[in-house]
């Protein structure tokens, strides 16, 4: 049985996309599904989906961006799934690291992150353009290393095509 593992430090256990739409559909189709989350809740199985906690919950956005990767990476190596899926932009490097270890890794590009940086009130206005440009370059270089990228809009799909990323769906 193929084992698919979702890694997230951003989304909750019952995120509508990860748990309800993707996870349940895969479990019902006969796949083993694990969702690894950064929270302090006990491990459990719901609707055939195994939830594993990192036993770590970041207290701030900065802490989440800096620390969740190491906790999720340790759990990912222990789980040894066939495919890992990541949806968090701050985990792009984690996916690349898993890919270098020989794992299959996919990224779910839910939003075009460089485009939404301009709306982030917590970022200084003067820095948003620079951060957006850097994020776009980082996203482009990272996603080329993934086995597949899932998109939700034609605009994002077209952008990935222009970047030369062929494995997007």
Question: Model-derived features: where do they sit?
Answer:
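Acceptor-binding helix/loop patch of EC 2.4 sugar-transfer enzymes
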Residues: 56, 106-137
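Membrane-proximal helix-turn-helix segments that form the acceptor-binding/catalytic region
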Residues: 70-77, 97-101, 113-114, 128-149
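A short, charged, and often flexible helix/loop element on the N-terminal side
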Residues: 49-74, 122-128
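Short N-terminal targeting/anchoring amphipathic segment
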Residues: 74-92, 103-106
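Short amphipathic alpha-helix
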Residues: 15-29
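Helix-loop-beta element that forms the nucleotide-linked donor phosphate-binding surface
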Residues: 150-151, 156-169
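Nucleotide-activated donor-dependent transferases that construct or modify glycoconjugates
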Residues: 1-19
């Amino acid at each position: 049985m193929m084992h698919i593992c979702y890694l997230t430090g951003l989304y909750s256990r019952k995120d509508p996309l990860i748990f309800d739409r993707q996870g349940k559909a895969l479990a019902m189709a006969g796949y083993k599904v694990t969702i690894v989350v950064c929270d302090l809740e006990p491990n459990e199985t719901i609707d055939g989906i195994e939830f594993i906690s990192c036993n770590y919950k970041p207290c701030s956005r900065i802490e989440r961006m800096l620390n969740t990767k190491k906790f999720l990476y340790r759990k990912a190596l222990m789980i040894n799934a066939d495919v890992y899926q990541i949806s968090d932009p701050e985990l792009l490097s984690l996916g690349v690291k898993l890919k270098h270890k020989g794992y299959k890794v996919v990224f779910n590009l839910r939003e075009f992150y460089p485009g939404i940086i301009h709306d982030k009130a917590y970022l200084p206005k003067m820095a948003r353009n620079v951060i957006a440009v850097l994020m776009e370059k980082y996203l482009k270089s990272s996603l080329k290393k993934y086995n597949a990228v899932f998109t939700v809009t034609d605009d994002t799909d077209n952008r990935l095509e222009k970047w030369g990323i062929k494995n997007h769906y």
